[in-house]
């Protein structure tokens, strides 16, 4: 279900913000997820299925239960993260502005909320959690197709499953990759045409490729990573408000389940309309061999 709001105007405003929220969080598809508009409280636990590399086959020896695959596990993820953004306009501003000022403000707020959530999740990608980088540290100007092949080789050495791999890289590294001769002159239309026209690389060397500009700037010197969904488990739910609001509900992407909460209320003394958007979520490392980091010098 797309949302749980009832007011037509609120539905229109909230739905306009769903696309920037979902598109900003697109790189989160690289991980194992359990997203839903189901209500939950902070510190509740959500079970996220994790599928790693399958166990080898064995010769039949009289029983089919001796080689039961145990690589499908469930990671308990605590919903211990809660971020929000609040916008407001005066009743006069809302009535006299030619464009829908609430929609414009909310789209910007929700995009920032999504960026902050994504940055927070990326803080889990550390040397302590995932070990040495895939390839030696390099600057953005040195990142090219051969670098991607080096990352691919590191994933193979780590026995990362070949399917469902993703490569998430900082915008500067992504831009340099767009200018690589092999990428730019590729005869594979989904790579070359989208790269030139839209600045998009959908698939490369077996990876789904995502550009991001929200990688945390800290001592880890992280600029990207290659990941299988088994690396990190992420959960997201709707935090149902306790107080009374003029309108409140969950806004959900029906395809991915990505959800943010929406609350509208009015401050009568100042004659201002407030809208708060929030995200209740949690994450944890699942299988360390499911991710290989990229770092800068």
Regions flagged by a language model, labelled:
Residues 93-162, 171-176, 293-297:
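Alpha-helical scaffold segments that mediate packing/assembly in large oligomeric complexes
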Residues 42-47, 155-256:
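Extended oligomerization regions of viral-like shell subunits
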Residues 56-59, 97, 176-179, 186, ...:
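Short helix/loop capping segments that flank catalytic or ligand/cofactor-binding pockets
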Residues 73-96:
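Short acidic, glycine/tyrosine-flanked loop/strand segments centered on an H-E-D-like triad
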Residues 48, 167, 273-277:
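Hydrophobic alpha-helical segments involved in membrane association or supramolecular assembly
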Residues 4-9, 17-19, 39-42, 108-143, ...:
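Signature of extracytoplasmic/envelope-associated structural regions
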Residues 1-79, 295:
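N-terminal "assembly arms/tails" that initiate or stabilize quaternary assembly
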Residues 259-297:
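Extended, compositionally biased alpha-helical segments that mediate assembly or anchoring
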């Amino acid at each position: 279900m797309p949302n749980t709001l009832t007011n037509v105007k609120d539905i229109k405003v909230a739905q306009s913000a769903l696309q920037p929220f979902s598109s900003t969080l697109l790189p989160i598809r690289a991980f194992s997820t359990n997203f839903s508009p189901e209500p939950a409280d902070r510190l509740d636990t959500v079970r996220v299925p994790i599928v790693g590399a399958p166990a080898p086959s064995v010769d039949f020896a009289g029983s089919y239960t001796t080689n039961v695959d145990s690589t499908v596990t469930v990671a308990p993820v605590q919903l211990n993260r809660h971020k929000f953004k609040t916008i407001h306009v005066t009743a006069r501003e809302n009535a006299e502005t030619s464009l829908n000022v609430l929609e414009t403000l909310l789209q910007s707020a929700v995009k920032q909320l999504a960026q902050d959530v994504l940055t927070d999740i990326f803080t889990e990608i550390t040397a302590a959690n995932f070990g040495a980088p895939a390839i030696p540290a390099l600057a953005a100007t040195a990142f090219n197709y051969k670098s991607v092949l080096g990352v691919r080789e590191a994933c193979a050495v780590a026995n990362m499953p070949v399917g469902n791999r993703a490569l998430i890289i900082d915008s500067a590294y992504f831009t340099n990759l767009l200018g690589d001769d092999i990428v730019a002159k590729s005869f594979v239309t989904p790579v070359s045409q989208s790269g030139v026209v839209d600045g998009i690389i959908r698939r490369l060397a077996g990876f789904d490729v995502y550009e991001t500009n929200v990688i945390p700037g800290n001592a880890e010197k992280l600029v990207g990573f290659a990941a299988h969904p088994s690396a990190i488990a992420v959960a997201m739910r709707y935090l149902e408000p306790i107080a009374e609001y003029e309108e409140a509900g969950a806004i959900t992407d029906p395809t991915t389940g990505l959800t943010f909460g929406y609350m509208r209320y009015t401050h009568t003394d100042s004659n201002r309309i407030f809208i708060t958007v929030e995200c209740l979520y949690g994450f944890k490392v699942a299988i360390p061999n499911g991710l290989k980091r990229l770092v800068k010098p």
